[in-house]
Amino acid sequence: MFTYQIKIEYLVTNFVGWQRQKNNLSIQEVLEKVLSKRLKEKITIIGSGRTDAGVHATEQSAHFKTKQHIDDKNTFINSVNFFLNKYPISILSIKKRPKGFHARYSAIKRTYKYFIINRRSSLVIEKNKAWHIRKKINEIGRASCRERV
């Protein structure tokens, strides 16, 4: 068996989050279906964390095991992304990892970004990607938030 780490980008707006759930579509479920189809074997994918509904990812790490050695990584990524094209999910990179690698337990750090847009007008471009606060936020509160996050 070979272990591969992938980096993924996705929007969770129309999903229940990362983790597979009965009767609801998740990022994990879509990736497992597409990878299983591409590799012609049942694939289980493990994420470095589990994002909730409404939480997007720009470089989520995950891993899967397969019987196949993936020689041409660019062709593999392109073919998987072709099948992912109807979803807001994309594989950014893939790396072969040693036996024992685990996306969650081998992670050294995690980075989170929180976007707050403070204005009266409704959000259009950033809708579902930021927390919209219509009331004016004071400067002291803003500085305090920067240091805590």
Regions found by a protein language model. Name each.
Residues M1-R148:
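Structured-RNA-binding interfaces characteristic of tRNA pseudouridine synthases
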